Amino acid sequence: MQNFIEQIQKCENLNDLEAIRISVLGKKGILTEGFTKLKGLEDETKKEFAAKLNAQKEIFNKAYLAKFKDLENLALEERMKQDALNFNYFDESITTGALHPVMSTMDKIIEYFIALNFSIEKGPLIEDDFHNFEALNLPKSHPARDMQDTFYFDDKRLLRTQTSPVQIRTMLAQKPPIRMIAPGAVFRRDFDITHTPMFHQVEGLVVEEGQKVSFANLKSALEDFLRYMFGDVKVRFRPSFFPFTEPSAEVDISCVFCKEKGCRVCKHTGWLEVLGCGIVDPNVYNFVGYENVSGYAFGLGVERFAMLLHQIPDLRSLFEGDLRLLEQFR
């Protein structure tokens, strides 16, 4: 047995170790044959011989298991070395990827409002008439409901035309106070130099109990936001109309391209339209069961902001995957 123990200690791999185990404990192994011979021995002799065999088996197993564990660890280390990444193969001159300008612009917008303790709310892309139109105070005759402008399914569901339905879902699920933005994709049947069938919006909503929220609050909040996005620009509010806000306004900033001198982008007005806003219409509160509350809402197109931030003249180029354009935003 001592000879086998010495062979075990000299083993350098698991295959050799297994060969030794078979020669001792295999079907024709030396100890196996010894146990087979016990059948023909008398009781006293059998007892004594069996004790010796069991002692030798225990010594062998102890040596075998210790060596097996050592060799298994060595084999594992070798496999880990073979599977390890060789960082010498990586070429540092290779350029890395980067966020698409639309996504980086959306991230910048979201980060701003998160810092002001706004929540991020999400909703389904496929909406129903109530959440997308009716609860937002859009009458049946409103042109946005027309098949020419909205993607409808056969079951009268539709692809949402704005992220405003998320505001309705949030108000139905929560009580004031609410400070939220709803970023996401929206869909309209439009495709030209400034419109695509799918684009991204960020809409915001602030609702407080009582009559605490005024247009002055809205104006101050949006002026700070627009200067955060575009730097030291002038901001102006123009009266407008949206079914879900009253009063409503469209917001312009001084042209970031020509600095109010007049150019093709601003149509020689010196101003660029960037978003819409207003005080939430009381009819909207009636649809969600709110009473004695006040608030404001606003909405912007992320692609529009990306175009202005990065001076991209054609909106469609953002979705064409042209590497010559996208490589500029690494």
Curated annotation (Swiss-Prot):
Keyword list, A-Z: Aminoacyl-tRNA synthetase, ATP-binding, Cytoplasm, Ligase, Magnesium, Metal-binding, Nucleotide-binding, Protein biosynthesis
Cofactor(s) listed: Mg(2+)
Binding residues annotated for Mg(2+), in chain numbering: E246
GO cellular component, one term: cytoplasm
Catalytic reaction list: tRNA(Phe) + L-phenylalanine + ATP = L-phenylalanyl-tRNA(Phe) + AMP + diphosphate + H(+)
GO biological process per UniProt: phenylalanyl-tRNA aminoacylation
Pfam families assigned to the protein according to its UniProt record, in alphabetical order: Phe_tRNA-synt_N (PF02912), tRNA-synt_2d (PF01409)
A GO molecular function held by the record: tRNA binding
Leader peptide range in chain numbering: none
Residues spanning the membrane: none
Enzyme Commission numbers on file: 6.1.1.20
Main location: cytoplasm
InterPro entries: aa-tRNA-synth_II, aa-tRNA-synth_II/BPL/LPL, Phe-tRNA-synth_IIc_asu, Phe-tRNA_ligase_II_N, Phe_tRNA_ligase_alpha1_bac, Phenylalanyl-tRNA_Synthase, tRNA-bd_arm
Domain of life: Bacteria
Location of this chain's protein in the cell: Cytoplasm
Details of cofactor binding: Binds 2 magnesium ions per tetramer.
Self-association state and partner proteins as the record states: Tetramer of two alpha and two beta subunits.
Family statement: Belongs to the class-II aminoacyl-tRNA synthetase family. Phe-tRNA synthetase alpha subunit type 1 subfamily.
Protein name, per record: Phenylalanine--tRNA ligase alpha subunit
